[in-house]
Amino acid sequence: MANNSMLEQQTAAAANPLDAHEYATRTAIRAIAIIASVYGMAASWQGLMTFTYFTNLSNLMICVALAGSLVLDTTSFMRARSLATNSAESAASSSSKESLEVWFDSKSNAWYVFKFMMTIAIAVTFTLYLCFLAPTNKLGFVGAYMSNGCSSLCVHAIAPLLAIVDFILFDYRFRSTSAHIYFATIPPLAYVAYAAMLSEFAGVRWGVHAMRAPYNFLNYGAPAGWFGFAPQTFNATTLGVGVAYLLVVFTLIFIGVGRVFLALKDARARAVLQN
């Protein structure tokens, strides 16, 4: 019953007209996020190795999601303005003048599912860097973000936070179910398999320590391996805990984050209906 009620609220929210101010706000947030993401990736470009890091892959995909939403919303907005302008009564009636500012979000729910998955992926980037990579960076916590012309800050904080804000504020029309939360764990887990295959079958190594994984929490080549414990080895190359255990913990955290995002999105949908 609760799920049906929420779906009805989300469907009703989808029918609500939007104004030019919301279009401008959406556009600004998405444009800034995309610029920050592209700058951050370009400033830290490493050739093909760039595409072996989850940070860059998640930033690429969130750029696709944000740019796609920007194009789709712009199309809907411009179509609404064009129809209103071409209306026979638009030049004379005040209601027509008001309609110039009204448009509807026409994105499909499948697109929202994709965007939600990419939002969780970029949230993974934000969370893991904040909690594990920045604190163990040789430059220190602040230095980790400010290095290389603040490119790290752009891809690990600015772009992720703006993408999360964009989802919560503007994707309340997304008709979500709990299954979508589990879909959103697919990209991070698929990346783990991708990185392991690069290491095992292509002999790729990462960083000055030639790690067998791009990140210390995935470095199964460290003494802790997949299922061990070696807390005394905690440093920039390992957390001293078996990678398998960390993956279980991370997955549970990401499921929790997904639930929080959907709860905030649903609260936003209810607020829109009340207004």
Name each model-derived stretch.
Residues 98-121, 177-186:
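Interfacial segments of alpha-helical transmembrane regions
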Residues 149-161:
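Membrane-interface loop-to-helix entry segments
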Residues 42-48, 131-143, 200:
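Juxtamembrane "helix-exit" motif on the non-cytosolic side of transmembrane helices
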Residues 158-176:
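Alpha-helical transmembrane segments in multipass membrane proteins, preferentially the mid-helix core
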Residues 121-122, 182-203:
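Hydrophobic alpha-helical membrane-insertion segments
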